[in-house]
């Protein structure tokens, strides 16, 4: 018997979906899991028989009764995913669906597909969901799987020496302003440094642009000191789509892995974890975020940095992913 895990290739190297699956697979392979590689492509170029042969090749190493962790979605469409699951059922594999994203919730125009996704999830022996909020949402939508595990936090594995963060009264934001346009005109007293190509903004905006940088470069720059800002696509939390409160933020893991505290909105699914562990601040507005940084003392900052330092080790070594993967395997084999 083997434990297998699916992985994704063929997307842009900047794709968060690809990076997340690659990271989880890297950590799973440290546990001895076998990789099943998917390529992102136009599945409609395949006939049904061609798709079947493609999946047979991908699954050639899967044995009868194996455990398979399916990182969902493959982004090749539900037809591809369902065909893969159907073949696993023939092999009587134990199926663990590791839900990274739920497209019908992520894209409201695709909500009509929700019953089909729930049906796919219900074929699992266990599911891993990002948060308690996502679990409750999927149960309300018809999820019937008994064994549900909570991920809670993304890991951010890396292997390079970082700086020791020093107090700096500024905020970082790692994300394209095309997706977060309300940050272009940031006018609060606390300076905001955005890792994104420069955009035209109000001359009075207190914003500077750092351009796009690689993951190692980003960690190195963040680790010099400051605080990491996590925020949604809307300025006002009341206007934020529901989905951002169901999934878990990659940004928060990046900042914490770099060793700096975070400021997150109260609707973030793991905001309570950040509050309880003293890893930063939970706020209800960007104005409050700026005010907190303005009033932060060097001593308060260094106390937080020390707590973040210990927590960042968990993210660097991949303990959140490893734990939930091991727990899931234990569940389906018990």
From Swiss-Prot:
GO biological process, one term: protein glycosylation
Domain remark in the UniProt entry: Dimerizes via the C-terminus; dimerization is required for tetramer formation. Binds protein substrate via an exposed loop in the N-terminus.
Self-association and partners: Homotetramer; a dimer of dimers.
InterPro entries found in the cross-reference section: Gtf3
Major enzyme class: transferase
Disruption phenotype: Alters carbohydrate composition of cell wall protein GspB, about 20% reduction in platelet binding by whole cells.
SUPFAM superfamilies per record: UDP-Glycosyltransferase/glycogen phosphorylase (SSF53756)
EC number(s) recorded for this UniProt protein: 2.4.1.-
Gene label: gtf3
Organism in which the protein naturally occurs: Streptococcus gordonii
Phylogenetic placement of the source organism: Bacteria, Bacillati, Bacillota, Bacilli, Lactobacillales
Function statement: Required for polymorphic O-glycosylation of the serine-rich repeat protein in this bacteria. Catalyzes the second step in glycosylation by transferring glucose from UDP-glucose to the terminal GlcNAc moiety of the 3-O-(N-acetyl-alpha-D-glucosaminyl)-L-seryl-[protein] resulting from the first glycosylation step. Part of the accessory SecA2/SecY2 system specifically required to export GspB, a serine-rich repeat cell wall protein encoded upstream in the same operon.
Protein name: Glucosyltransferase 3
Superkingdom of the source species: Bacteria
Gene3D superfamilies: Glycogen Phosphorylase B
Binding site for UDP: 16, 179, 249-254
